[in-house]
Amino acid sequence: MECLRCLPGLLPRAAQPRRALWTAVARLSLAACGGRATPLRSRSPKASSTARAAGDVLRFRTSDASQATLASVAQVFAVTKFDKEGNVTSFERKKTELYHELALQARDLRFQHVMSITTRNNRIIMRMEYLKAVITPECLLILDYRNLNLEHWLFRELPSQLAGEGQLVTYPLPFEFRAIEALLQYWISTLRGRLSVLQPLILETLDALVDPKHSSVDRSKLHVLLQNGKSLSELETDIKIFKESILELLDEEEMLEELCLTKWSDPHVFEKSSTGIDHAEEMELLLENYYRLAEDLSNEARELRVLIDDSQSIIFINLDSHRNVMMRLNLQLTMGTFSLSLFGLMGVAFGMNLESSLEEDHRVFWLVTGIMFMGSGLIWRRLLSFLGRQLEAPVPPVMTSLPKKTLLANRRMDVKNSLRPEGLGASRTILASR
């Protein structure tokens, strides 16, 4: 015990303040766990403030480290910016920095391969499968355009359209109208291009399959038609989603008002345009125009689908006819075999080990053979004629046409009988009885 009492005196002086700090931290933890609080109160306020400062520093360092870790793993967007004059700038931004600059939330920049048009904090967010865009009153941002083959449209066509030099209907309107029309026009042209590629391929394949010169169906053509049918189904789904997304906007008047971004930032835009139409109505007309274009594409795709279904029915009919021919041939051969077997019993009778005087005559062999073949032929012909009568299509009954004058006379008699009053007939019978 005396050695333990002398141990603090043997420790270096530099270790004593550290030991005091450790003791204070241990007592703080005991007080938090429900231990004695009296020794903690008896400690000096200097030790408690030192422990509190150490905890704050540790907490701040942990939060800074977590933020640095999240920033290091954040998604980086390749952004292309288009302003009102058509100037183009490209840069890279992390997802956290980008939604802070645009006053958006993280879920607003979570782009899935779906078609949607939404508004948030005076911003328009457009998702068109692989095309991701954010529209503000001053600029248009295209995100992650790399590896999408969009360079020609982005850097040659889109700047002139946004600057009002292209063939856009909304060039005298605010910037967001031109941006929305340019994106919708690009998507409609993309869908139309896919349809124009599929249409000649499908028609060529159908012509080859339905050609009456070919008695059999080429399986390679059927495989090509199956692949084109799948592509057509995907195109129909994309067109349907595009129509539904635009129809949702047309059904909500508040959404149409929110799409007019400049209306909320510039008070002069509240006035009606030169044509006397409000900007919300012009947005509605714009969306209705592209909805009609999508409807036309849907009708063309539906016509192709109807052609495929009709050709499929024709192919099935041809296959059924070939199958019927094969079944008829099989039935004819079966009848011939039955006829030969029936008259072959005569040969079986002569083939038995029985003696008769007919075996000695050579003419009997040829006579019996001739009778067998003639009888088999006659029976086969009778069976074939019976089969032909059964397979013939029934003749529809002949309707005898009555003369026109007879029909008119009968009709007049019916009209007279229907117009004759019942009371008059009753009175005549009473008078006749009197």
Swiss-Prot record:
A Pfam family: MRS2-like
Tissues of expression: Ubiquitously expressed.
Residues the record lists as binding Mg(2+) 2: D320
Activity regulation (UniProt): May be regulated by calcium ions.
FT transit peptide: 1-53
One GO CC term on file: mitochondrial inner membrane
Binding site for Mg(2+) 1: E234, T237, D238, E303
Keywords: Ion transport, Magnesium, Membrane, Metal-binding, Mitochondrion, Mitochondrion inner membrane, Transit peptide, Transmembrane, Transmembrane helix, Transport
Topology in the lipid bilayer: Multi-pass membrane protein
Ranges of the Mitochondrial intermembrane topological domain: 351-361
Topology, Mitochondrial matrix side: 54-330, 393-434
InterPro entries: MRS2-like (IPR039204)
Record remark: domains: The GMN motif acts as an ion selectivity filter.
Function field: Magnesium transporter that mediates the influx of magnesium into the mitochondrial matrix and regulates magnesium metabolism. Also permeable to calcium, sodium and potassium ions. Required for normal expression of the mitochondrial respiratory complex I subunits. May play a role in maintaining the inner mitochondrial membrane potential.
Protein name per the record: Magnesium transporter MRS2 homolog, mitochondrial
Organism: Mus musculus (Mouse)
Gene that specifies this protein: Mrs2
